[in-house]
Every structure is written in structure tokens, then in C-alpha cells.
Amino acid sequence: MKLRKPFRILRNLILFFFISSIGAVIFYRFVPVYVTPLMIIRSVQQLVSGEKVVCKHTWVPFDKISPSLPMAVIASEDNRFASHNGFDMIEIKKAMKENETRKKKRGASTISQQTAKNVFLWPQSSWIRKGFEVYFTFLIETCWSKERIMEVYLNSIEMGKGIYGAQATAKYKFKTTAAKLTRGQCALIAATLPNPIRFDSAHPSPYIKRRQGQILRLMNLVPKFPPVDKEKAKGQDTKKQKNKKKKK
């Protein structure tokens, strides 16, 4: 009897975790993500260190973000984003091979994995977090569209000290809106994503400027995102032609 109670508690905890995690993923399929664990952690760190707490974040829908920004982050972070199932096995194998001889290990996290980490987990790397990251990545790839994953990613990712998401970055770094970000500005933002605290997209270092140039070139090779629905586009063209005939 003594053994049954702990097992029952453990079973209930596991059941609660699965139900609540699936519920949270379904919830965020439709509802904007206004706060993330990283935002809270960074704010607490600032408070503890005696700094002024800065947390700039404004959610905007995907169609209010410059189309160049998803192209830039795909070119920089995850060029197979539109086609993989959340995990880029080609990059994972490359990273594993390179890490055999490298002191500084390189990762192979996809945009989907980064989104799962940003929205549901904590930033410190560990095998436990990686395990949860795989689980949540599978869930969002199953429950969300690629466009929704990108929308959440561009609205939640850290893009500067106390700055999160495309709209806040556009406002505080470039004095504009997310919709009006230029191609060059989007490439600068993408160039700083590996370390947005160290690198500043508004005042780029020579290294970031070189990365910007590389990303701009790669953007020409990346397929348009989100992919154009041929049937939908055909229907819109037909509608436009009919409207023109009516006007005549």
C-alpha cells in the first residue's frame, strides 16, 4: 500500500503534465503569446542585479510583419524550415560530425525548436531541457501550421536587451514598424539572433555587417515564405480579371 501511493502521485503528475502541455499548445494555436518564460527570467535577472527592468514587447499578426523578415531568419537560422518536420536531420548530422573536432560546439536547432524553447521552456541548456524541447517541438509541428510557428517565433524571440519580437525591435532599433522593416534591416536583425545581447542590429559591428551581406545573398536562394497557394492565387487572378471586365 505504501508503494502504491507514490506511484499514483507520479502517475497523476505525468498525466497532468501531458494534458496541460497539450492544452497550452492548442491554446497558443489561436491566442497571441504575450509573455514567455525568457521575458520573466530576464526581468528577474535585471531586478536582482539592480538594473532597471526593461521588457519591450508588442504582438503583431503575421501579415503586419515585413515579408523580408521570415525570409531573413530562414536564410540565417533554418533554410529547410518550410520542409522539415521540426528537426533538420541533415544539419544535426553535420553538427555532430563537426563537434567531434571542435572545442566550441555548434548547435542545429531549427526555428520550430527555438519557438518551443522560447514559449514553453527556459534558456539554460541541459539534457532535460532538450528532452522537453523535442516533445514541445513535436506538439507545435503537429498542432500549428508553419506560418503560425513563424508568427510566434518572430513575436517572441529575443532581439536585444529587454526587446522581444519584430514590432518592438522595429520601434526601438529602427524607429519604424514591423511592417515597414526594409530588406537590409531584416538581414541585420537575423544576423544578431545568435547573440542579440552582444550584437546590436541598430549599431552593427563589421562582423554583423558581413553577416548581413551573407544573409541578403542567401535570401535570394530561399523559397518564398509562406509558400504561395497556387489554387488560391489562380482564384484571385480570375477574380481580378472579372472585376476588370465589369469596369469596362
Curated annotation (Swiss-Prot):
Q: Name one GO biological process term.
A: regulation of cell shape
Pathways involved = Cell wall biogenesis; peptidoglycan biosynthesis
Composition bias, Basic and acidic residues: 227-240
E.C. code: 2.4.99.28
Q: How does it sit in the membrane?
A: Single-pass membrane protein
> In the record, what terms sit under GO molecular function?
pentosyltransferase activity; peptidoglycan glycosyltransferase activity
Tell whether Secreted is among the UniProt keywords.
no
The record's subcellular location field reads: Cell inner membrane
UniProt main location, coarse: membrane
Q: Does the keyword Repeat apply?
A: no
Q: Where is this region: Disordered?
A: 226-248
Q: What is this protein called?
A: Biosynthetic peptidoglycan transglycosylase
| Organism of origin | Bacteroides fragilis (strain ATCC 25285 / DSM 2151 / CCUG 4856 / JCM 11019 / LMG 10263 / NCTC 9343 / Onslow / VPI 2553 / EN-2)
High-level lineage: Bacteria, Pseudomonadati, Bacteroidota, Bacteroidia, Bacteroidales
